[in-house]
Amino acid sequence: MNADVLTTKVTDGIAVITLGSAKRMYFDAEMGDALTESLQEFAGDPNIRVVIVTGGTPGYFNRHFSIPALIEFAEAVRASGRQWPDNAAYHGGFFDKAMALCETMPKPVIAAISGTALAGAFEFTLACDIRIAEDGDYLIGLPETELGLLPGASGTQRLPRTIGPAAALMHILMGRPLNPRDAEKKGLVHETVSGKAIDRAMEIGKRFCSHTPESLGYIKRLVRSAIDTPLAEGLALERNLFMRLCVSDQALARMRSYEEKKITDPSRSLEA
């Protein structure tokens, strides 16, 4: 795999995907394919418990989708005469498979936002389960209206599901990205850290690795589906998955250990 596109590394069950280099700070079709391939590999590997995606250049997670590539695509479409009525069939975009993998694999996916993440780059992070940003002089968000566009890689759909429709509408219409601290205040990211985002992501990843993979997968499945599932159905699935875990060897062993005082504080904070 071209190291300018992305690199991967696995440490103690945590897979880290590092996007691009100083030569390649933009999303494009090649990076989309490489990212999808890596995510598919890690999703199917039982030895991988957590996946982290981060940037490969100081000050950048990934700038945004390649504008030259988008112009070339738009000109080709114009020449074809193709039209897009509201009811046109949806065929997916460059990063749809990668984002779907982030959401559906039964493992936590963490975006360690190490710098600028605009437009398509930020939209990709919205498909990740956790977003950690490092503090700095850079921007996060959706500026597409400045180019006469709209967020076309899921931003109009995933951001409302993340921060609510009203806040999402304001952010997208304004087209003004936020600094990391303001992004945290608005709910675009979960945390902003003064150190390296990758260090905090690894800390969280190690905490997740201390849990059983079954519980992590079930929790992700339940919470991810909650917004689109009728409450009665969600509660029924929650109870079924709870019982499946409750009778498992791992859960019984941990509960017995807790009763025997071998585990003194099962609810210790991530901040500990």
Predicted feature locations:
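Conserved CoA-thioester-binding segment of acyl-CoA-metabolizing enzymes
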Residues: M1-T54
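Terminal low-complexity tails and localization/encapsulation signals of metabolic enzymes
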Residues: A3, M255-A272
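Terminal peptide-recognition signature
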Residues: I17, L35, V53, S66, ...
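Charged catalytic carboxylate motif
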Residues: E30-A34, F94, L101, R200, ...
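Glycine- (often His-adjacent) and acidic-residue-rich active-site loop
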Residues: G55-K97
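Crotonase-fold acyl-CoA enzyme core
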Residues: A100-P213
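C-terminal long alpha-helix characteristic of the crotonase
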Residues: A133-Y138, K186-A236, R244, D249, ...
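Short alpha-helical scaffolding segments that buttress acidic/His motifs in well-ordered protein cores
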Residues: H171-I172, I219-V223, F242, Y258
